[in-house]
């Protein structure tokens, strides 16, 4: 069995210049495929609000929903590190709430780490969760939970603030940081400055690793996708063809045949 990915393994990968792969998953079948294909980290993202639940943002997602989906993913993952994404208002309210809710991901759902959005503003949460023995992945730049405050999903270009946020989350105890929606030159500077790994999403090739939403990467999401997404397959098209073929065969009585029937 391949070595389980841990914070120590990720630190070694950064030190040796080996790129880190991360994808989202929200259920057992996809998590199993992602894990068996060699992805290093599985993010159970609050993005499930948009790609699974049909919401227009991640804001409505609840802790109970995140714990449920993380449980399914953790059950499937044998090698990959499972990271539970802390949803809106699960950590913003207080340090105590942050630690309690982070603990639910580990104790109830079986995750190995949690992710939360924000830089300096959540440093006390990162520190407290880390001191409770829970690995924390930070997330700076474009932070979807702050979409209203940012005025939409916009590229973040404030270099000094981004560099400062990155430094502060590292000092607070984060083992990694997601860099979302920032110019690649800034992401490169952050990656060279930090000793912890940077995982990019719309942040260029110089990050220590990359993450994508699986529904975007596999073409399951048929709506608008950001510029930074590459669709590696067109699963929605294949699924539609199969569903249409099924409907046609049932209507025409081509299915089921004797091969699919019992005597």
UniProtKB/Swiss-Prot annotation:
Binds 1 Mg(2+) ion per subunit. Its EC number is 2.1.2.11. One of its GO terms (cellular component) is cytoplasm. Its main location: cytoplasm. It catalyses: 3-methyl-2-oxobutanoate + (6R)-5,10-methylene-5,6,7,8-tetrahydrofolate + H2O = 2-dehydropantoate + (6S)-5,6,7,8-tetrahydrofolate. One of its GO terms (molecular function) is 3-methyl-2-oxobutanoate hydroxymethyltransferase activity. It is an enzyme of class 2 (transferase). Pfam families: Pantoate_transf. InterPro entries: Pantoate_hydroxy_MeTrfase, Pyrv/PenolPyrv_kinase-like_dom, Pyrv_kinase-like_dom_sf. Mg(2+) binds at residues 46, 85, 117. It comes from the Bacteria. Pathway: Cofactor biosynthesis; (R)-pantothenate biosynthesis; (R)-pantoate from 3-methyl-2-oxobutanoate: step 1/2. Keywords: Cytoplasm, Magnesium, Metal-binding, Pantothenate biosynthesis, Transferase. The active site is at 180 (proton acceptor). One of its GO terms (biological process) is pantothenate biosynthetic process. It is found in: Cytoplasm. SUPFAM superfamilies: Phosphoenolpyruvate/pyruvate domain. Catalyzes the reversible reaction in which hydroxymethyl group from 5,10-methylenetetrahydrofolate is transferred onto alpha-ketoisovalerate to form ketopantoate. HAMAP family: PanB. This is 3-methyl-2-oxobutanoate hydroxymethyltransferase.
